[in-house]
Amino acid sequence: MNPIYFQARFLTSAPDLRRMPPDQGREVAFAGRSNVGKSSAINTLTNQKSLARTSKTPGRTQLINVFPITDEAALVDLPGYGYAKVPAAVRRRWDQVLPEYLAGRRALRGVVLVMDLRHPLTDFDRQMLDWCGHIGVPLHVLLTKADKFKAGAARNRGQNVGRQLRAEWPGVTWQIFSASKRMGVDEAHARLDEWLGLGPAAGEGR
């Protein structure tokens, strides 16, 4: 566990790239379908209850939310996608903004794709995997809500997803995760450390 993530704070919500902070430093983006536990995962990784807003209404996150950790490193919460009740105009805007961000943001160092372990590899997940693979953006899959299964069953389901990832998207890494049980925090921090350059030494020096 790296406590440097606990100092993350909210900076801004941007509807598109033009209103994002300057394209510098390092960013890791969190993406995922609506209601997969993306906001809860960010809150757990930063040890904060409400840094990223959680809602029982899927599709509530409609803007790009930026959470700086240091002057040179930030987490980015991308809009939750794929919920039918989101207005069509909003969906069209998301469909434009997401590929623009992935392809055009120089600060982007990696994407954490959040999937519900109960319903992994949806059409949206596969689209994200294809996009990131085509653009060359490193991707780590966070299989959330592992607490809904017994430990052995969660591990087996994760390994099944891992086999599919290796077969279709070589190089993509994955792990199981539970926000409520704080399962997988150390492993996720290690991946973020690598992408953001925030190893233990960075945390001690600030």
UniProtKB/Swiss-Prot annotation:
It comes from Alkalilimnicola ehrlichii (strain ATCC BAA-1101 / DSM 17681 / MLHE-1). The gene is engB. SUPFAM superfamilies: P-loop containing nucleoside triphosphate hydrolases. One of its GO terms (biological process) is division septum assembly. Mg(2+) binds at residues 39, 61. Its cofactor is Mg(2+). This is Probable GTP-binding protein EngB. The lineage of its organism: Bacteria, Pseudomonadati, Pseudomonadota, Gammaproteobacteria, Chromatiales. Belongs to the TRAFAC class TrmE-Era-EngA-EngB-Septin-like GTPase superfamily. EngB GTPase family. InterPro entries: G_ENGB_dom, GTP-bd, GTP-bd_ribosome_bio_YsxC, P-loop_NTPase.
